[in-house]
Amino acid sequence: MATSAIQHSSFAGQTTLKPSNDLLRKIGASNGGGRIIMRRTVKSTPQSIWYGPDRPKYLGPFSENTPSYLTGEYPGDYGWDTAGLSADPETFAKNRELEVIHSRWAMLGALGCTFPEILSKNGVKFGEAVWFKAGSQIFSEGGLDYLGNPNLIHAQSILAIWACQVVLMGFIEGYRIGGGPLGEGLDPLYPGGAFDPLNLAEDPEAFSELKVKELKNGRLAMFSMFGFFVQAIVTGKGPIENLFDHIADPVANNAWAYATNFVPGK
């Protein structure tokens, strides 16, 4: 399903406005010492190959006519919605928002699933580096030490972890959906300001490209997370160890070999 971001001309939480030199005018001394009047313009349509009717489609030149509601207005729109899940405008807007949020979580999750294993294989000591085994350490006698260091976070209660998760995530989601601390109308997907310390949204054209890149990498990360779950069930190993096993013996360690020999519960 081709879903995407919630907006098309609003950048970094509020409309990105780029004053050009010819839009600055100084009124003479007759206006009390002079004052600056700034008129700002907005580019509503990104000038990019990823937008508009001529954007790349999901099957390239073999793509059929795309649905009328997929116009290329939003990033990540490849014209694919075979099931018509986004035909309703409200559903379409909701799906775009859900995809962006889940993409970001998946990218963080994929990093969290692989990075501890990489560090562990390079000599960094963890209590448990495999992502789906790490959480169970909280049930051990000594509890769970983050990064294997008891001086960081020493967790011993699953209920306390659950409560903190609910409270913190509820607060963050409320902040996001509410448009900021005072309902300031910040964009729920691209709030900008303190959330854009590198000023990546300063240039509207560059930002429109970054939105596409975010979704492309996010979709890949969601598929990766699905693969990590399947690997955990089938092999009982983490993604990095599975990768090393495959490199060492590609014939014996691949999806087809495991699929033909997999017996649930063994």
From Swiss-Prot:
Cofactor binding note of this UniProt entry: Binds at least 14 chlorophylls (8 Chl-a and 6 Chl-b) and carotenoids such as lutein and neoxanthin.
Main location: plastid
GO biological process: cellular response to abscisic acid stimulus; cellular response to water deprivation; photosynthesis, light harvesting in photosystem I; photosynthesis, light harvesting in photosystem II; positive regulation of reactive oxygen species biosynthetic process; regulation of stomatal closure; response to cold; response to desiccation
Residues the entry annotates as binding chlorophyll a 6: 246, 255
Ligand binding (chlorophyll a 5): 213, 231
Summary of the knockout phenotype: In plants silenced with microRNAs, functional LHCII thylakoid protein complexes where LHCB2 is replaced by LHCB1. However these LHCII complexes are impaired in light state transitions, leading to stunted growth in high light.
Record-linked InterPro entries: Chloro_AB-bd_pln (IPR001344), Chloroa_b-bind (IPR022796)
Protein task: The light-harvesting complex (LHC) functions as a light receptor, it captures and delivers excitation energy to photosystems with which it is closely associated. Mediates rapid phosphorylation and migration of LHCII-PSII to photosystem I (PSI) after transition to state 2 (red) light conditions, thus leading to the formation of PSI-PSII-LHCII and PSI-LHCII supercomplex to balance the relative excitation of PSI and PSII. Involved in the production of reactive oxygen species (ROS) and stomatal closure upon abscisic acid (ABA) treatment. Required to prevent water loss.
Protein name, as recorded: Chlorophyll a-b binding protein 2.4, chloroplastic
Taxonomic lineage from the root: Eukaryota, Viridiplantae, Streptophyta, Embryophyta, Tracheophyta
